[in-house]
């Protein structure tokens, strides 16, 4: 008997006052996979993540998640001068169980230390969060989601702007989480990363253009539909053309 999916999205439409962000989106997210959300700016990637998280109210349709959900937001350059250590930030993941006003018990501190070690940040546990690089902060936020013991992990552009070693290390962490049976959904603009690192790709442009293995979802025809024809073949590699470029 096949396992039930981790999450099911049926006929999801999300409309804001001035625009419709998602239109009749339906998909099933299996257990134990890394799913890439790919699409142009304004395609609805972040809106879909928020719908899965439960922080966006659908205008129509439904979202069902079997298990707990953790969210890793985009990491900006500012706002990191708070007097918090990496361990303090990771420990915030326990507040769902303990509440914000209670002192976390020792077991929660152990869980936070284990999560930091799992993302390769154990040796930085006592460092102030503002002293860490962007890639290191991203790992700390992932550790916070792990402390939540989330079954469905949602990440908003975690490898954007990362150097090659950081991207590889982060991707290896996601693969390990997948192998533990978690479902990992990653919003990204990086076609090469999604093709190499994701088990499934959901290509969005306000609606689902394609959903399946990267070789199918990221073929030239699907990409042209999602990006308005701004896709060119460079030495056998499909890339997004710069604005104003015309493919021959």
Give residue ranges: language-model regions:
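H-loop/switch region of ABC-family ATPase nucleotide-binding domains
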Residues: 188-189
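Conserved ABC ATPase signature
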Residues: 128-132
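Helix-to-loop junction immediately C-terminal to a conserved catalytic motif
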Residues: 53
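Catalytic Walker B motif of ABC-type/P-loop ATPase nucleotide-binding domains
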Residues: 153-157
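Conserved switch/coupling elements of ABC/ABC-like ATPase nucleotide-binding domains
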Residues: 206-216
């Amino acid at each position: 008997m096949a396992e039930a999916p981790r999450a099911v999205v049926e006929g999801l439409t999300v409309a804001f006052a001035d625009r419709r962000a998602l239109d009749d989106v339906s998909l099933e997210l299996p257990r134990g996979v890394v799913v890439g959300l790919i699409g142009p700016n304004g395609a609805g990637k972040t809106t879909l993540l928020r719908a899965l998280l439960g922080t966006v109210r659908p205008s129509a349709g439904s979202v069902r998640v079997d298990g707990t959900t953790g969210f890793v937001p985009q990491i900006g350059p500012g706002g990191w001068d708070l007097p918090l250590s990496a361990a303090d930030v990771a420990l915030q993941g326990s507040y769902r169980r303990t509440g914000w006003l209670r002192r976390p018990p020792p077991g929660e501190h152990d869980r936070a230390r284990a999560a930091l070690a799992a993302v390769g940040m154990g040796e930085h546990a006592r460092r102030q969060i503002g002293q860490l690089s962007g890639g290191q902060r991203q790992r700390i936020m992932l550790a916070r989601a792990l402390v939540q013991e989330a079954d469905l992990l949602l990440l908003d552009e975690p490898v954007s702007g990362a150097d090659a070693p950081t991207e590889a290390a982060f991707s290896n962490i996601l693969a390990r989480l997948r192998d533990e049976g978690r479902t990992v959904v990653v919003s990204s603009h990086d076609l090469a990363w999604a093709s190499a690192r994701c088990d499934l790709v959901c290509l969005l442009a306000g609606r689902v253009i394609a959903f399946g293995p990267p070789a199918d979802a990221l073929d030239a025809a699907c990409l042209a539909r999602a990006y308005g024809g701004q896709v060119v073949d460079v030495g056998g590699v499909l890339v997004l053309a710069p604005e104003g470029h015309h493919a021959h």
